[in-house]
Amino acid sequence: MKSGMTRLALGTVALLLAASALAEPVADLEGPIGGWRNSKLTNELEQYTAAYPKPPVDRGAQKYRTLIAGRIRAAGKQRRPPVLVVNGNAMPLYGDGEGRFARPWAFGPGSNSVEIVSADGQSRQRLQFYEADTTKTSAKLRAVLTWDDPRAEVDMHVISPIGDHAFWAQPLLSDGGGLDVDSVDGAGPEIFSTAAPRPGVWLFYVNYWGNFNAGGYNFDEKAHDRDLITAQLTLIYNENTPNERREFVTVPLRKIGELALMKSIRF
């Protein structure tokens, strides 16, 4: 009896894996390219790149980042967005009306991966590339803030051990770390990183600032998709190294103007 149940369970698992493998890709991924690469041999990282769709406020673009770009095939037909997973960091993937997207990411040396997963988890596309430029700096501390309402404007605020404050109006810290400037407006995620975090206590806050739509920003309590917004903070230490570790914090947001301390860490 147990043997028969085991065979049945194994058969079910095999069918699920086969269905997942045969599922249509959720997106056409145009970049990055898988395989071996050396940033010193190209000028890609010297070019200015910005997120797309363009956020409500254009804060320009930044250098030294690689574009994760492509097109979501079933744009506008899904209730939930697909998920973009970069080096294990999961975040909602939103596109424009035609499904096009571009997410800049500062990849470090070594093995890197990009994966797009359908909302139901049945389709997975994954590519991997190896960055051979060992002079590139890796983020010793990275924070990724995501939330589940694309019409809500949610902000991350980071306070450094010396009192520096990184947020949407002043995204960079005096010592060089800070928020990606084009991640601070729109549906997110918001990304903070530093290659040399100061020793001491770091504070990470989340603020439900307002909402936005085609007409711009607004403070209408009903102009969003969810009554309860779930914000998740992912903290990555020593990213893409043998010493990498992660922490996850989830906070509910109910009202515009709400401010909450998500995490306090000592580095």
Region roles according to the model:
Residues 23-62:
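Short, compositionally biased P/S/T/A/G/V-rich stretches that sit at domain boundaries
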Residues 18-20:
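N-terminal signal peptide c-region/cleavage motif recognized by signal peptidases
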Residues 90-98:
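Short beta-strand segments within Ig-like beta-sandwich modules, predominantly Fibronectin type-III
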Residues 66-76:
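Aromatic/hydrophobic beta-strand junction motif of beta-rich domains
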Residues 123-133:
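Edge beta-strands of extracellular beta-sandwich domains
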Residues 109-121, 204:
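Short, aromatic- and glycine-rich surface loops/edge beta-strands on solvent-exposed regions
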Residues 136-267:
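Intrinsic-disorder/low-complexity signal
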Residues 104-111, 198:
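Surface-exposed, short loops/turns at beta-strand junctions within beta-sandwich domains
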